[in-house]
Structure formats: C-alpha cells, structure tokens
C-alpha cells in the first residue's frame, strides 16, 4: 500500500458503525469521482491520487455530511459521524 493512496474509514451514527450508508469521493472541484456503500461494520475504502478530496456521506434519515480530506501516498484514515 505504500505506493498507493488509500482513503478509508468508518461511518458512525450514535457512536456505532453504520452499515448501508453511501460515501462519495469528490475531487478538488467538487466533481463526483466514485461512490461505495459502507460494509456491515461501517467501513469504506477508496483508491485515489494524492491531493485534496471531499467525502460526502449519505445515510438514511440524516443530512449529507461533507468531510475534507488531504490524502498522501499511503493510508489516510477518516472517521465520519452522521446525525
């Protein structure tokens, strides 16, 4: 993984991992790049280029949550909390 840029993390609601949410990866201009569902344990993962990204998390019954991330080569871990 040292030569790749990975953005990964866990989506939480009420301090518990949230399955079935969707996390979108937006580039520095806000352009949609990719989308993945969270796993049964709330986890998500993207392979991306180094740079500034926005994670947009969509979960049933919650407002979308945007989280800015600066990713470098290697693994960038991000926790996202939805209402």
Where are these regions (language model features)?
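Structured interaction patches on ligand/partner-binding surfaces of diverse proteins
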Residues: 60-83
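Short, ordered, surface-exposed loop/turn motifs in non-cytosolic proteins
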Residues: 5, 13-29
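Residue-level detector of high-confidence beta-strand sites
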Residues: 20, 35-37, 47
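A short, solvent-exposed beta-strand micro-motif common in secreted/extracellular proteins
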Residues: 51-61
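Short, acidic Ser/Thr/Gly-rich low-complexity loop/linker segments typical of extracellular
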Residues: 28-43
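A short, amphipathic beta-strand motif
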Residues: 5-13, 42, 80
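A glycine-anchored, Pro-Gly-centered beta-turn/N-cap motif
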Residues: 49-52, 74
């Amino acid at each position: 993984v040292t030569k790749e840029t990975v953005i990964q993390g866990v989506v939480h609601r009420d301090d518990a991992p949230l399955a079935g949410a969707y996390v979108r990866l937006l580039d520095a201009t806000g352009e949609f790049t990719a989308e993945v569902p969270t796993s049964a344990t709330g986890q998500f993962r993207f392979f991306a280029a180094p740079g500034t990204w926005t994670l947009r998390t969509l979960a049933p019954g919650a407002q979308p949550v945007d989280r800015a991330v600066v990713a470098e080569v290697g693994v960038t871990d991000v926790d996202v909390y939805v209402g």
